[in-house]
Amino acid sequence: MFYKRTVLVGALLFTTLLGYSCTNEFSWTEPPKWEPKPKPDPSSYDVTMETLLDEMISFDEATRFPELSYVCREESSRDRRSVTPGTPEWFANDDGWGYVRDEVNGGRAERVLFDEDGPGVITRIWLTSFQSPTAVIRFYFDGSETPNWEISSFDVQEICASLGDEWKNSLLRKGLMQPGDKWVRGSSLYLPIPYGNGCKITLEEQDNSLVNPSRYYQINFRRYDPSVSVETFSEEVLERARDRITETNRTLLNPRVRMSGRLVSANRVLAPGESLVLSLPEGTKAVTEAKFSVTCDGTPYADAMNDLLLTASFDGTQTVSAPLADFSGAGPGAEAVKSWFLTADGKGGVESRWTMPYRREGEFVLRNRSAEHTVKAEVSARVNTYEWDDRSLYFHAARKESRDVRIILWNDYANGYDWNFATIEGGRGVLRGDVFSIDNRTNNWPGEGDEKIWVDDEDFPSHFGTGVEDYYSFCGYFRYLSPFGGEPRLDSGDFNGFNNHYRQRSLDGIPFNRKLKFDLEMEGHEAGRADIVNTVFWYGDLQTRAEGFE
């Protein structure tokens, strides 16, 4: 517990993020005192809580390849029988019982959920369970044999206390924390948890009446090069960064873009087959905000947004191609979205905060692909100067449509298969987001398949998840919107029809040097068929491409 005060203060932070009052009792037995090494001034570290929070909300930094070398990875409760591709066990789906190992610490039987050496930072934690959350989660930092931080529940939302009265009624609820409001304990934490020389997370069950309870989790993290110095998460760090944490949370809920620069726009009525072109100012610049407005006047709204194809070209190469409905983050139907990079009102207005740099020239094109409908469209872009360097990358977005995709019953391992969500190759890049829209023909949940993401030359996926609902941070099969994940469309309670999801990545963006392969097991609670539309967003070298996309 850092110990007494820090259990409270460390855990306190999370409830202040939620705005809940404390309902759990904390108890502890005083362990042998752990004496951390004296910490130098924060400015001597390459990575601190403040640098991470600044990076999280920097649209400019998102355009650049990481300056400090790291790989992005995921630890999860996936079925540990999945070891060898091509075998039935590769698709095993008992995902609530996977963990690293069992061990005894201080006389306690603990399951190790996460264990990393060297410098790193946890960028996302997602937890849920179908049993009682009565358990204790402990964090051990920098090789400590005693826990530095203790949480009295297997539930991110139940981490409670207070950092001060001024936080109790704040809006700190759905920025750095995404609570599972409509589902028991399906919550995500995006507050970064840095560590200088290793981190171990354990779980101790407290309810003896539970027999091998399911504990689902995903932990996304960065593994830095050993040469990178990282300041470890502590009570002192939390207190010092209090104001920055508050401001970051507010910014995530109400994103701000640079209001300076030159504003250019174009509009026209688009008959079938016609296009609206917006040329951008020449020179080394960046689009820091783009807005799109569509007026249908008799044309069905969903059809109009699906028929309007947005393309963007920079320095002579097309890097964006997606219907406006998919580019907005909503998918078919173009429902409302409120996320970090994108906002849509569900009525024809779309605001993009993706920064799009270029060295010489750029243009947007909206083409009306309808054979019968006429619409009025307007495009505007705010263009600013941009400092191009050897880390700078171009913005890319691509979309594909897959018909009659086979959904396998979740426990039919022998017939399991991986459907390719996206393969991006041709140079450096950072995966920044995706939209997954599945038009389901069954009357059951179609998203039990795990994501598997392979980076460059990995012989095993560095990201191996526990299901579509967990990847998109909702777990409850309900409509919701948040900065980094959401489900803007859910046609029916039995999941028949469209189920649309988005995920956007800041600190958990996945860098790659040559190639990124994203597979998804197609498994559900009922065998059947579905049509799928998916879109990927990434920053990459100009020549990078998503295989098989528009």
Question: Model-found features: residue ranges?
Answer:
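Beta-strand-centric surfaces of beta-sandwich/beta-rich domains
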Residues: 34-550
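A broad, structure-centric signal for solvent-exposed, well-ordered loop/edge residues
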Residues: 8-9, 226
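Bacterial N-terminal signal peptides
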Residues: 9-19
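Bacterial N-terminal signal peptides that target proteins for export
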Residues: 1-8
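Bacterial Sec-dependent N-terminal signal peptides
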Residues: 20-39
